[in-house]
């Protein structure tokens, strides 16, 4: 349990408000984003390079690309408002910046459950820097 707590504390600063994103993924996908996607493929988790390995990894690739287009706010720190309706993330709030962050995560949160059947356990903890030698796709 202590290891899990340490891991969570260390990861909070890696990809924005990870606790909030983890909660979103748990609600929508019904599984832990940290355990299932924290170091999955070439793009799920911190950083990324190479070609996405499957549909879930592509979702993370698109998520990373969209983060680069968020303007006038800090997607790595700002907290956004959302709700879940019938298994779909719905962004709320009046702050346009925070709404952009939510929409980036909304896309990924709504797509990951669709790819649960194609999740490849053999690319969990995929050493992207070693094996993803192909040039990265443009966003």
UniProtKB/Swiss-Prot annotation:
Belongs to the phospholipase A2 family. Group II subfamily. D49 sub-subfamily. It comes from Bothrops pauloensis. This is Acidic phospholipase A2 BpPLA2-TXI. Its EC number is 3.1.1.4. PLA2 catalyzes the calcium-dependent hydrolysis of the 2-acyl groups in 3-sn-phosphoglycerides. Expressed by the venom gland. Its cofactor is Ca(2+). GO terms for molecular function: calcium ion binding; calcium-dependent phospholipase A2 activity; phospholipid binding; toxin activity. Residues 1-16 form the signal peptide. It catalyses: a 1,2-diacyl-sn-glycero-3-phosphocholine + H2O = a 1-acyl-sn-glycero-3-phosphocholine + a fatty acid + H(+).
